[in-house]
């Protein structure tokens, strides 16, 4: 049964001055709130290796934020902002980023009403030679509301990934209320980001430095990675009072066969770094169920965890994915998830969570509440009254799941 949840029950007062507009000078100097068995204490983030159990697996999302925000201009002079969401033609991220003359993407189009279908030129007010040489253009293929399919074309033989690096800007969250700056290219990106595709950072990972990662390894924890490309839906508030009416956007993810085998055999506690890692890990169970019941993986529906009973164990589910991959000689598996994690969700894989402090009335607050129960209010009250910084560039928390 889909839970009857009112989003107003997950509100809290967040003054604008508590939203971190910029990162601290050092990634690991942020504050860290630890919640375990109803108790709260605080540390500096660089102390996190001391707080973690050594017999655990720590899972990071190694997606990379792309400079997905582009500005074009009509012949009339009107500016049109185009925000790339996901590739359409070619559909695979790596192939689209490797394209050297054209590709099409699903995009959010700012000032959309002013784009009448004419071909746009990239906005280049300073006449930068490298940008001028590309002669980048945008053509509207189709439109649906504020989104549309846009075909980009350019000269010079550059791969599209390089085109974005030269012409685009990092799409920082709207609640920062500022334009993207040079510092964001470095700091709105995790140190271990590897695979391009996200339009928002998995911000729990922004605090990790090489020294912190080395200390975690030295303590004996297993470090693993998954890759979920974070979509623009991560910025969307829950607009309907009834959470059941909130649509989740599909986000693609990839996990490797080696990772699944390690996860299946370790028997250790699992620490997820960020809500995107949680959503990937918890989606795996339903991917495995699909392999058992239909013989193949399928995308995870938003309400799949709540609308039926599941008789399969987590071990059986993971075994089914592994068997499917081995049978088809796959070293990695790609799927999509719309999973929403709300109070009442049964966690099957994740035991601990590293995460920032999230917006009121957001799906991320619902996930935290599902993880720690009603104590989410106590945690957030503590953070507000103890000078913690909030949202993407804010401070961090280490949460133990309420058993």
Range-by-range predicted roles:
Residues 1-403:
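Surface-exposed, charge/polar-rich loops and edge strands
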């Amino acid at each position: 049964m889909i839970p009857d949840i009112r989003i107003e029950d997950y509100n809290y007062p967040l003054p604008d001055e508590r939203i971190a507009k910029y990162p601290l000078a050092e990634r690991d100097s942020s504050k860290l709130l630890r919640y375990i068995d109803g108790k709260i204490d605080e540390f500096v983030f660089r102390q996190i290796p001391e707080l973690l159990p050594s017999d655990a697996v720590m899972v990071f999302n190694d997606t990379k934020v792309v400079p997905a925000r582009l500005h074009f201009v009509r012949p009339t002079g009107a500016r049109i902002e185009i925000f790339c969401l996901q590739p359409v033609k070619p559909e695979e991220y790596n192939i689209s980023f490797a394209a050297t003359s054209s590709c099409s993407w699903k995009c959010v189009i700012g000032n959309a009403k002013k784009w009448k279908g004419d071909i746009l030129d990239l906005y280049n007010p300073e006449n930068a030679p490298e940008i001028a040489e590309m002669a980048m253009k945008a053509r509207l293929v189709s439109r649906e509301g504020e989104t549309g399919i846009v075909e980009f074309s350019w000269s010079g033989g550059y791969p599209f990934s390089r085109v974005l690096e030269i012409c685009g800007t990092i799409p920082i969250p709207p609640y920062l209320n500022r334009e993207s700056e040079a510092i964001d290219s470095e700091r709105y990106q995790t140190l271990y980001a590897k695979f391009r595709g996200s339009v928002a950072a998995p911000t729990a990972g922004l605090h990790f430095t090489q020294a912190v990662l080395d200390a975690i390894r030295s303590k004996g924890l297993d470090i693993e990675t998954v890759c979920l490309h974070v979509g623009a839906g991560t910025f969307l508030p829950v607009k309907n009072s009834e959470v059941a009416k909130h649509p989740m956007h599909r986000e693609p993810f990839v996990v490797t066969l080696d990772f699944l085998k390690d996860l299946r055999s370790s028997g250790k506690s699992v620490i997820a770094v960020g809500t995107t890692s949680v959503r990937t890990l918890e989606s795996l169970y339903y991917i495995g169920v699909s392999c058992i019941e239909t013989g193949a993986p399928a995308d995870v529906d938003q309400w799949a965890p709540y609308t039926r009973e599941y008789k399969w164990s987590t071990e059986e589910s993971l075994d089914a994915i592994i068997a499917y991959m081995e049978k088809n000689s796959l070293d990695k598996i790609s799927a999509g998830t719309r999973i929403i994690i709300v109070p009442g969700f049964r966690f099957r894989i994740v035991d601990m969570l590293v995460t920032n402090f999230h917006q009121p009335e957001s799906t991320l607050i619902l996930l935290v509440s599902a993880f720690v129960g009603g104590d989410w209010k106590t945690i957030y009250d503590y953070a507000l009254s103890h000078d913690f910084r909030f949202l993407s560039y804010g401070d961090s928390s280490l949460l133990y799941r309420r058993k």
